[in-house]
A protein has these predicted regions:
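Compositionally biased, intrinsically disordered or flexible polar/acidic segments
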Residues: 504-625
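Short, solvent-exposed turn/loop segments enriched in Gly/Ser/Thr/Pro and often Arg
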Residues: 101-106, 125-129, 159-172, 184-188, ...
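Short low-complexity, flexible loop/linker segments enriched in glycine and/or proline
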Residues: 172-176, 195-200, 204, 283-284, ...
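Stable alpha-helical elements in mature extracytoplasmic
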Residues: 143-146, 165, 169, 196, ...
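Substrate-binding clefts and catalytic carboxylate motifs of secreted carbohydrate-active enzymes
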Residues: 8, 17-21, 216-221, 227-230, ...
Length: 625
């Protein structure tokens, strides 16, 4: 088929099998409907098929002039109705309807991705088919809801990972306008197993044949991080070499199969951040390459992200690239004023993605990116702060958006005003108060408007200019509840309103810095030893403070070094309270007035040493009653 702004044709092909005991005289008609429902064109042909035989047909329309092009912004669909009749009686024997769209695209190592002849940045999301408590058995409406949520955020591209998903998902991609990468599940390692190659071939052919009519699909994928586990498990050359040879042979074979099935779309693989894929020859097989990059999460630092991309581009300038995965985990119970990698705080995920997204948007040779993942999803082998959950999602498992969702919405939705106080994930706050002075805590706003004014309990805190779709105010907290409101002038002409507003109520618990001169009767001081994060328990709403060094008249640790672990803590839902410690601590001191106090200790053995006695207060010789 051929398509341009001036004209386009539709190629219709298929098979008809005559299961009857006598020959069949048939009439096959194809009717093409414009997006508005009017008939654009029809084709008829007479067919004669002998008993038990199969007939393959192939018909191409004459040019349809000035076709309405399919894009994520204007997903115009043409309907192709195929009707099979008995030629003599005109009885309808079979009938089918398929939707298609007119669009063309290209990938280029220097210019990135183009759609219908124009540069187009792929703003994407990876998506697993999963939701608590039903697992992968989502209903059609759940699939449709996910695409609606992605579109509302401003996404135009989805990586359907790592396996073909329900037809309802692709139908919604076609209808609402979402470009798609679909792939078959080949991961971890290519085994020396009889029938493995044939099974992979069959999976690839089935996926393409089932879904090739969808105009949303632009690339077919196979293999995800195929060398990651291979290189971890096999270090010796004599062990690694045959596996790499099998992997390369399988990739070459699948590329041939893919091109046999579909020459109108491009092929791709997703690599983890290792140049080994290029060194062994995998990088030159597919039309485009995807990079799964996590600099600043699984090691390294944030700026390593753009450095890696630049290195790859310099070495292989003709390779079109997509960043097929990037992301950081977040647990809404964890918050930090000094976030760092792998603390699972909401704030570090925001910091990470606020660094990555501008790189993707501003680097012309990058075709686009797909954030990993759209949802918090089940992951059987994970421990971390939320066992069995990969929590890198932009929305929670129940599809409630995290605050970071609105950063993407502010960046990607230039057609509407976006203003969101990014504190829905941190509504119970706490802080150390010096005397009667208010506690200053940051409040962030995501917006695509140039300037924001913030109010606390009706009092203006002034205005700030937006930078990277975010504004952060230092807000004074001093009472149990505050109402925070944001206001911005609407510069988006699409909506006839002068100002955009958002508001939220935040709870606050002050903790006195000077314990010695304070009435502590109602004080509940909870400390997460060794942690830099605030932790609010789902079960009690109690907020545990980050650890701090001892100060006179206050409280804190004496000596030791902060350590952490990501192992699952059993028999509790408050795992993050037990995953940090101070190794070699000399003491913990509270300068409190004379009186009677209740002290609770929470213990676990994160080093799995199974010590018989972890701690017994009565055995310490320096205990003072």
């Amino acid at each position: 088929p051929k398509v341009s702004e001036e004209k386009g044709t539709i190629l219709i092909r298929g098979d008809i099998k005559n299961d009857a005991t006598q020959k069949a005289l048939l009439e096959l008609e194809h009717i093409i409907y414009h997006p508005n429902g009017s008939i654009a064109q029809s084709l008829k042909q007479s067919i004669q098929i002998k008993a038990g035989e199969q007939y393959s047909f192939r018909s191409e329309t004459s040019p349809i002039l000035s076709p309405q092009l399919w894009t994520p912004e204007t997903p115009h669909l043409y309907r192709v109705e195929s009707i099979l009749r008995d030629k003599k009686t005109k009885t309808v024997l079979d009938q089918s309807n398929h939707y298609t769209g007119f669009r063309w695209f290209s990938f280029d190592g220097e210019r990135g991705f183009s759609l219908n002849g124009k540069p187009y940045k792929l703003r994407g999301i990876c998506r697993h088919q999963d939701q608590k408590p039903i697992g992968v058995a989502l209903t059609d409406e759940m699939h449709r809801r996910d695409i609606k949520l992605m579109k509302e955020m401003g996404a135009n591209f989805i990586r359907i990972s790592h396996y073909p998903q329900d037809d309802a998902l692709l139908e919604m991609c076609d209808k609402l306008g979402m470009l798609a990468w679909e792939e078959i599940p080949i991961i971890d390692i290519v085994p020396d197993t009889p029938g493995y190659t044939e099974n992979c071939e069959r999976n690839l052919r089935e996926m393409i044949r089932q879904h090739y009519n969808h105009p949303s699909i632009i690339t077919w994928g196979y293999m995800n991080e195929i060398l990651l586990v291979t290189q971890r498990l096999y270090k010796k050359e004599e062990e690694l070499k045959p596996i790499l040879e099998r992997t390369l042979a399988l990739a070459n074979r699948l590329e041939v199969v893919l091109k046999e099935e579909d020459t109108t779309r491009v092929s791709t693989m997703a690599f983890h951040g290792s140049n080994s894929y290029n060194e062994v020859g995998l990088g030159s097989i597919t039309d485009i390459v995807g990079w799964n990059l996590y600099q600043g999460w699984y090691g390294g630092n944030l700026t390593g992200f753009e450095q890696y991309l630049e290195e790859q581009h310099k070495k292989y300038p003709s390779h079109p690239m997509i960043v097929s995965e990037y992301g950081a985990g977040s647990d809404k119970r964890l918050h930090s004023l000094q976030p760092h990698a792998f603390d699972f705080s909401i704030e570090y995920q925001q910091k990470y993605l606020e660094h990555y997204l501008p790189v993707l948007e501003e680097t012309s040779y990058i075709c686009g990116g797909t954030h990993w993942n759209f949802i918090d999803f089940s992951s059987a082998l994970r421990d971390e702060s939320m066992p069995r959950i990969n929590n890198k999602g932009l929305v929670y498992s129940n599809r409630t958006p995290k605050d970071i969702y609105y950063y993407y919405k502010a960046a990607w939705r230039q057609d509407i005003p976006v203003l969101h106080i990014a504190s829905r994930d941190w509504t119970h706050r706490s802080g150390i108060q010096h005397g009667k002075e208010p506690v200053i805590l940051p409040v962030k706003i995501y917006t695509n408007l140039p300037e924001v004014e913030l109010f606390i309990d009706g009092k203006s805190l002034g205005k700030q200019k937006t930078k990277n779709f975010a504004v952060t105010f230092e807000v004074p907290f001093c009472q149990k509840e505050h109402f925070i409101a944001a206001k911005a002038e609407n510069r988006k002409a699409v909506q006839d309103i002068s100002f955009v507003e958002d508001g939220i109520r935040l709870n606050f618990t002050p903790i006195p810095a000077n314990l010695n001169g304070t009435n502590l009767r109602d004080l509940e001081l909870a400390i997460n030893v060794g942690s830099y994060c605030f932790y609010t328990s789902d079960e009690s709403n109690l907020t545990w403070l980050p650890d701090q060094p001892y100060t006179e008249n206050g409280w804190g640790y004496i000596g030791g070094e902060s350590k952490s672990s990501q192992i699952q803590i059993k028999n509790t839902n408050d795992g993050p309270l037990f995953q940090t410690l101070r190794n070699g601590i000399e003491g913990y001191r509270f300068d409190v007035p004379n009186g009677v106090y209740e002290i609770e200790f929470l213990f676990t053995d994160i080093f799995r040493e199974n010590a018989t006695t972890v701690y017994q207060l009565g055995r310490n010789s320096d205990v003072e009653n």
